Amino acid sequence: MIIYKDIITGDEMFSDIYKIKESENGMMIEVEGKMISRAEGEIDDALIGGNASAEVQDEGCESTTVSGVDIVLNHKLQETSYDKKSYTAYIKDYMKAVKAKLQEVAPDRVDPFMANAPAEVKKILGNIKNFQFFTGESMNPDGMIGLLDFREDGVTPYMLFFKDGLEIEKC
């Protein structure tokens, strides 16, 4: 399994269990998810052991159903909010941080990143009202923000991440 982590914070953003594709210019990674519902807080009787029928029936523990996009739920991404002005301020600082990190780990990626990132940012800002914003589990404001949108069908969610803001960890 391959886990994609934020190079700034080390937060897990997504893994290779999803359908992943790279944008034409190689700047963005698009990860397709799906809407899911799952119970949380439920304890499986098989894990407890013993003979449940011989004991007094208990109401069990509270369980809640959580619904959302599988990428967000599985990797504990935290929702945040931006408008055009605040995202512009964030992305300027983020691009500087990624550039500095790339100079350390992949100097050959600095020029392509700085040349192509502004066009991607312009596309994002032009479509900003459609996006939901998610940060990693640590909620570090300096880290990567994943952008969630839905395909034209209105049902299929996908997330966008800056490729150069990710590090790959093989498990």
Swiss-Prot record:
Keywords: Calcium, Cytoplasm. GO terms for cellular component: cytoplasm. Its main location: cytoplasm. It comes from the Eukaryota. One of its GO terms (molecular function) is calcium ion binding. The keyword Transcription does not apply. It is found in: Cytoplasm. PROSITE patterns: TCTP_1, TCTP_2, TCTP_3. It holds the Pfam family TCTP. InterPro entries: Mss4-like_sf, Mss4/transl-control_tumour, TCTP, Translation_control_tumour_CS, Translational_control_tumour_p. Involved in calcium binding and microtubule stabilization. Belongs to the TCTP family. PANTHER family: TRANSLATIONALLY CONTROLLED TUMOR PROTEIN-RELATED, TRANSLATIONALLY-CONTROLLED TUMOR PROTEIN. This is Translationally-controlled tumor protein homolog. It comes from Labeo rohita (Indian major carp). The lineage of its organism: Eukaryota, Metazoa, Chordata, Craniata, Vertebrata. The gene is tpt1.
